Amino acid sequence: MSIEIHASAKNLNLWYDSNQVLHNISLDIYKREVTAFIGPSGCGKSTFLRCFNRMNDFVSNCKIKGELIIENIDVCSVNTNVVLLRAKVGMVFQKPNPFPKSIYDNVAYGPKLHGLAKNKKKLDEIVEKSLTSVGLWEELSDRLKDNAFELSGGQQQRLCIARAIAVKPTMLLMDEPCSALDPFATSVIENLIQNLKKNFTIIVVTHSMKQARKVSDKVAFFESGKLIEYNTTDEIFKNPQSSKTKRYIVDHL
């Protein structure tokens, strides 16, 4: 298991207008591990997740103070190239959101945008490798021209993951990636997350304690915009240090 730090937050605070949503968050995210963010609705876990690729920029009157460093990139700096940041830090949302394009073009869009493929052959290789990584190549290699909306929900979500990794990120953010999926598709995604950590650092927000326990190496528990506890998954579930953490886990298992 890696001990190399991939991202580090120090005294991170965030406001929407005068409402403070995050309070002095400090934690390190380690390379090629899965870190789960858990906590009640409105606790700030998704807001904190969106700090990693500046998705909070789309929220008006959002103000951030503190430090968030990802691979020597000062994420909060006004000088940071946000387009390149979002290529390095991919994101998968709650509901599958494929582009209204073919399966092939969904995956090829990012590499073409960022100039990662010099020719059609190279682009084909990226598409095949990305779809293979999420277990879709064998299922869909003869359907690449089909519209992505024709896929099942689980396939669409895996396609969105393939689209994210096609631009060669080092980190993947997943905001409740299974919340709109059936149990079978959820199991497929959970197994995929465990496999993808061989090549990517993954942060997943989840309301499912079973999912957090299954897929993660470390767990961060949030409440009221504060980081209450952060430890290995085994320690969080077997020996939580905070009574708040213990109560939340017991109530949601």
UniProtKB/Swiss-Prot annotation:
Keywords: ATP-binding, Cell inner membrane, Cell membrane, Membrane, Nucleotide-binding, Phosphate transport, Translocase, Transport. GO terms for cellular component: plasma membrane. GO terms for molecular function: ATP binding; ATP hydrolysis activity; ATPase-coupled phosphate ion transmembrane transporter activity. The gene is pstB. ATP binds at G39, P40, S41, G42, C43, G44, K45, S46. This is Phosphate import ATP-binding protein PstB. Pfam families: ABC_tran (PF00005). InterPro entries: AAA+_ATPase, ABC_transporter-like_ATP-bd, ABC_transporter-like_CS, P-loop_NTPase, PstB-like. It comes from Ehrlichia ruminantium (strain Gardel). The lineage of its organism: Bacteria, Pseudomonadati, Pseudomonadota, Alphaproteobacteria, Rickettsiales. Disulfide bonds: none annotated.
